[in-house]
Amino acid sequence: MSEEKLNKNSERAVTKDTGENSQKIMSEEKKNYSDTLNLPQTDFKMRGNLPQREPEIQKAIFENGLYEKILKKNEGHKHFVLHDGPPYANGEIHAGHALNKILKDTIVRYKSMKGYYSPYIPGFDTHGMPTEKKAIEKLGLDRNKIPVPKFRDTCKEFTKKYKDIQTEGFKRLGVLGDWEHPYITYDPKMEARQIGVFGDMYKKGYIYRGLKPVYWCTDCETALAEAEIEYKDVTSTSIYVKFPIVDGKGLIDTDDTSIVIWTTTPWTLPGNTGITIGADFEYSLVKVNYKNDESKFAGEANSDLNVDDKKQIKENNKKAVDGTNSEKLILATDLVDKVMKLAGIEEYRTIKTFKGSELEGILCKHPFLNRTSRVVLGSEVTVNVDLVEGTGCVHTAPAYGKEDYLQGLKDKLPMIVEVNEKGIQQDGAGPFKGMFYAKSNKAIVEWLDEHNFLLKSEPITHSYPHCWRCKNPIIFRATKQWFASIDGFREDTLKAIETVKWHPLDWGKSRMYDMIKNRNDWCISRQRTWGVPLPIFYCEKCNEPYVTEESIAKIQEIVKNEGTNAWWEKTAEELMPYNAKCPKCGCTQFTKEKDIMDVWFDSGSTHQSVLVERGLDYPADLYLEGNDQYRGWFQSSLLTSVATNGIAPYKEVLCCGMVVDGQGKKMSKSLGNGISPNDMSKKYGADIVRLWVLSSDYEMDVNLSDEILKGISDVYRKIRNTLRYMLGNTYDFDPENPVKYEDMQEIDKWALTRLNKLIKDCTKDYDNYDFKNCYHDVNQFCVVDMSSFYLDIIKDRLYTEKADSLLRRSAQTAMYYILDALTKILTPMISFTVEDVWKAMKHTKNENVESPMLADYPVENKEWDNNEIAEKWNKIIMIKDIASKELELSRADKVIGNSLDALLTITAGTEDYKFLKENEKIIRDVLIVSQLKLVENKNAKSVLKNADKNNVEGNFEIKVEHAKGEKCDRCWQYFEHLEDGLCERCKNVLKQLN
């Protein structure tokens, strides 16, 4: 590189003063002493050009096997295993992936530099509905018209494509790992291990088949787990419906009396078999009078009712004609006024009150079906009746809700499922047969109104579950499914939670604890084909399930060798043990289960299929994912691990938030506010993306926008310039021959105390996963301690002293130590930039020069801890802060051009004057002024008294004048006497050079 280019590039290396002074040196043609100055020299460019440079570094890193070399270096050391939660391989990576993977890479890099053997095996989740849906959409497939093995092969090829795309995306972000051998959930060895986990749980009695309500997506036609549900606000119709009493148990006259229920899901009324009330609540029998002689009696126009019901209605109508236009309603006492007002009923009075428990067993006529609904008592475990909304009388359909199901079990209510897998109402839905459930809502409300069963309807906005993949509303629907019984190991799981270190501690642990304590059994079956089959056979004669240790072992062996396609390609006889017989009836003919395992069972089993299978540590040291994984991967992994081995699969759990845009809105294609990592890397560089992640409060939702990235880029430039300045000024330094600490200049010793603090603080930050604090520590060190102070002050020594002088080498020694440690601290952060810094640096003979990742993380040097120097320099820094303000004002007033043009007079009290006088030369150098004059004022108070507490009391009296004498042509300081335009020092240096 030419000297002219070097000098130009050094202009803005650190501070404004440095730039101005360097420029002036080069611009003065009449007496150009530039060839006598030690100007910075380095191949490390001022501009990073990261989008162009990083791919070159990335190529070299992976071609040279850096990851493998890191593992080899730390072989035999203590392990640290971060187990990767697998992203779905069904699309390109997004900003959330970048946040996740960069956090993981930062931790693994840091641990590796600390000497830990820290393998990182990236994973890919490839099975299940997420992939099926994408493959069907993008390839235009109809899974019902393609043979299962062919459809599965198509899905596999689809996931392979995106696995490769995502791999390149993660590598572009600088993520190191075993990318040649990732774990992929369609890998036959993994599938076989997963089947083994299922077998272990089945053997222990934790797996069962049952008919109960589950989340069901009518679009995807499959059951869903809680982790596959998203909630959105929707507007529904809430209705108040009259159920006429047909058997009052001698307590209530059935004559024109109804119980009023409330529901927001009219489509579930065909499944109603009960009305749940609160045992301890008070209920009122309320007589209501209607205006305008308009009959409101339930069922007046219902032609489908039987003869007795019609007789009752006729009697009611007769009363209406006689002027008795009234009826009686039962609802919770506390809600009477609210409901009457809502229904527009002005005339009503309470006839009688009852305790809820007295009403148990009363029978009501279903509004449009020829059956009765029984009054039952709720509880905290079943239907928990409240007096906040509705009527205190809860519509109960055991087939369509968790609490309803439990209520039905308790009170032996019939479970009637009238909606099929596509969401269509069936024969038992009466007049609504053949309707899609959502459309039947309106039809049911209109029918109830027309037939006078509807007291009131109104819109209500509430949070409602939606499918995570197709984004459509889902329903609760009772179907036969396979479940993992959480009750079987719930207490063990709660105990295991106590053994884990959770981040954030304040709510991470309690969140998981509450989820496990209150969760339902886990529905593990899915009505899809792309996944690991449930390894279950059924007796053709009696339908008894067949699962044995032998059958599991044989399926595992077949799958390991042939993959899970074998389940669909082979007969049951080929898959089962020889001479298998039904344990119940002795039959030897079997059929295979058609469903696959929940995709969360896939990833939730990786503690066995990856950690144990690959000989890694189990439990892992750390799981790190988004906070949505408390109900996803964190939980499924915990459940399968405790169920099979009695322990949590992880020692620590760390979670991050979601990525949102600059205004805090969720990123989405429809809003057009998403920024892809690929686009960010092309525009700004991956190191900027990494700094964005590490500068964020990642445990909360993380904002991302172009403005934020531009701000991060500015910080990056300051850090880069600091590194470049030190590289440029250590070009001729020999690391094998540093200046001993005791021989170093005091300011250089001070710089090393600051470095020691940086090492200490950043080590603590990395250990605590507090990357934001580490980022700020580094930024503060580079901008405040180095660029604005230390490096600005020592430039005179670096440029003008003899190259091998003790003064210059002392500064170089400090800079070398700082550059070395700072580069290593930055290595987990800006992983591309540091590779170039490392190659531009000087190194000791024994140091690995290939990459900073093969170096050890810096440790504190106790020799550099010097409290006396730290306290003294606190005062000097305060003096500089006070004086700099006056110098800036004088510069603005054109009294001086730069600080070297100044004669500075400081008037101070006796105590401060003494300190100033003792350190006069140091302070002059620190202030970067040509001349310093000190004046004592015995009446002035001490300004520096509490400097050790970073507290300045008042100000010095400071006067700024233009310096006296002439300016040295070489160092630009002013002196009373010059010889041939040179000061005494510069003249001596030139003599030595000649």
Which functions belong to the PLM regions below?
Residues 274, 281-289, 309-393, 402:
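Protease-associated
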Residues 376, 951-978, 987:
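C-terminal accessory/binding modules appended to enzymatic or scaffolding proteins
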Residues 125, 214, 218, 224-232, ...:
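Acidic, turn-prone loop/beta-hairpin segments
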Residues 2-7, 28-50, 54-56, 60-64, ...:
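Residue patterns forming the tRNA-binding/recognition surfaces of aminoacyl-tRNA synthetases
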Residues 74, 78-85, 96-99, 103, ...:
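Secondary-structure capping and boundary motifs in well-ordered enzyme cores
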Residues 411-423, 528-530, 549-701:
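Alpha-helical recognition segments enriched in aromatics with Gly/Pro capping
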Residues 223, 473, 545, 588, ...:
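Cys/His-rich metal-chelating microdomains
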